[in-house]
């Protein structure tokens, strides 16, 4: 049995009020279509097809590495016409699973069960019984309970609007008769569109069995038509992500106030406070604590690390036992060594900080290599930029740098050196000694402060 998948992604999404095509609207940090495409790929079918229309170039550009085939719906004439656009690619397939680019929560397990339960020669459709069916197509059954067709909401008669069994959209269709069914569809309906759902009546007329598949969890089939629905799906998606991590041992103070926009993996006994954001690929080792308001992006965090509130870590590695923040910013290319401390209002960029070193207050450490056991005093700046190029600062082991020092790169500071507070260092500092660069202190006795002129 050869199965293809067609993802319908041609809609403009006018109710989104956005220049971005609807299927590119982000969910969990990725376009909605990316979630659908990943699920389709997990099913390992013969071939995946994507039908685009509005903003088709932008949609294709967002997925340069996909192996899916692209098809263009030239005019927005409805879902039936959209599927017709992909018919040439279905040659050789026995059946086709139709998915939607704006229904991103479906799981591969659910779709695999749908495919397995639908008989080979049947038309399969997905249904659910809900208390509020407004806006959904209704499932029409005969006196024997057999599915006769689907009536879109805007075309329902008064008695049909009371039906609570709804069509969720996903279908399995036999390929051999499909072209004829689609060719016979018309746009004589309330929306003036060619409905894919009308193939159900066509299949019945040709003697095909219509096989309804009821989803155990109808939230998987939630779609997006406007920003309100997108926000609802975002919360559902985040709850799903966090629930899975909690079941693996992650402790979260308030799951409703933590967002994952990428992939988060955790060791044992990790703790996450409210309003934390994880972006990209983030790994937490064992016993990591993440304080309120922190942002972690594409970061690897070692065991026993404490990240204090409102710290931002991006593209960095944090060694075991380190302490970050509060209000610290760790920028890309940074490696923080074991048991190192980066404190409040310290910014570190493209720097390597050795084990046990500390920069606890109000410093900028950029393009630097700092050894082990170094103390960086408050207000220390590595002056790495000359207006045209970046230069590196090299600091050895067991160095003490006094407060309010400027290290003008390129510069090397030897092991065990001490830099006096308030120094501007422009030359190499030898190991072991005390280096100062200050104007001599002097006092002007009986000095008078300036006074304002009287008017």
Swiss-Prot record:
Q: Residues that bind UDP-N-acetyl-alpha-D-glucosamine, according to the entry?
A: 8-11, 22, 73, 78-79, 100-102, 137, 152, 167, 225, 331, 349, 364, 375
Cofactor: how and how many bound: Binds 1 Mg(2+) ion per subunit.
The question of whether Magnesium is a record keyword is answered with: yes
Query: What EC number(s) does this enzyme carry?
Result: 2.7.7.23, 2.3.1.157
Essential cofactor(s): Mg(2+)
Q: Extract the ranges annotated as region (N-acetyltransferase).
A: 249-455
Disulfide bridge positions per record: none
Functional description taken from the UniProt entry = Catalyzes the last two sequential reactions in the de novo biosynthetic pathway for UDP-N-acetylglucosamine (UDP-GlcNAc). The C-terminal domain catalyzes the transfer of acetyl group from acetyl coenzyme A to glucosamine-1-phosphate (GlcN-1-P) to produce N-acetylglucosamine-1-phosphate (GlcNAc-1-P), which is converted into UDP-GlcNAc by the transfer of uridine 5-monophosphate (from uridine 5-triphosphate), a reaction catalyzed by the N-terminal domain.
Protein name according to UniProt: Bifunctional protein GlmU
